[in-house]
Regions:
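N-terminal membrane-targeting hydrophobic helices
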Residues: 1-171
Length: 171
C-alpha cells in the first residue's frame, strides 16, 4: 500500500474520538453495570483503544510490520490481551477488569465493522477461523467525522448530570 493510504490508516483522529465517545455513551445508557462504575470505567476506555494500540501503533515503529500487526486488532487477539492484562490485578478485581476491557474492545470492534473499509481491508474479525476481512459498510470511511460528531453528541445528550443541569435551568 502507498504512503497516502497508510497515512489515513495511522492517524484516524475521528475514529479514536468515536471509540472514546462510544464508551461514554455506553456508560450513560448502562450506568448500573459494574464495568461502568468510576473505578472500572477507565478500563472500558482503555479497552476501546486496545485494538489500535499495537495494530496502529506498530506503523510508527515500522510500516513494514503494519499489516502483520493487524492481527492484534482481531477479537481473538484482544481476548488474549485482556486475559494477560487482567492477570496483573488482585484476584477480586480480575473479573471486573476483564469485563471492563472486553466491553471496551467489543465497542471498538462494533464501530469498526460498521464502517466501509480503508484500503484493501484490515478488519479480520473472524481470524483465526478466516483470513477474510469483514465490513458491513453501514457508512463510508470518509464519514468518520460525522460519526465522531454524532457519537460525541449522543454521549453528551445522554449524560445524566448534564440532563439534570439542563432541567434545572429550564425549571
Amino acid at each position: 500500500f502507498n504512503s497516502t493510504s497508510s497515512k489515513n490508516l495511522i492517524y484516524p483522529v475521528p475514529d479514536l474520538i468515536s471509540h472514546a465517545a462510544s464508551a461514554y455513551l455506553f456508560r450513560n445508557l448502562t450506568s448500573k453495570l459494574k464495568v461502568c462504575q468510576q473505578q472500572f470505567f477507565i478500563l472500558v476506555l482503555l479497552g476501546v483503544f486496545l485494538p489500535d494500540l499495537i495494530a496502529r501503533g506498530s506503523a510508527f515503529l515500522d510500516r513494514e510490520i503494519f499489516l502483520a500487526a493487524q492481527y492484534f486488532h482481531t477479537p481473538f487477539a484482544c481476548f488474549f490481551q485482556t486475559v494477560v492484562i487482567s492477570c496483573f490485578f488482585v484476584k477480586s478485581q480480575k473479573a471486573p477488569v476483564f469485563w471492563a476491557l472486553t466491553t471496551g474492545w467489543i465497542l471498538h470492534q462494533a464501530f469498526d465493522i460498521m464502517q466501509g473499509v480503508l484500503g484493501p481491508g484490515y478488519y479480520f474479525i473472524l481470524w483465526p477461523l478466516s483470513n477474510q476481512s469483514v465490513s458491513f459498510g453501514l457508512f463510508p470511511d470518509s464519514a468518520w467525522y460525522c460519526v465522531a460528531f454524532l457519537t460525541t453528541l449522543a454521549a453528551f445528550l445522554t449524560n445524566k448530570s448534564l440532563i439534570k443541569k439542563i432541567k434545572a435551568k429550564i425549571s
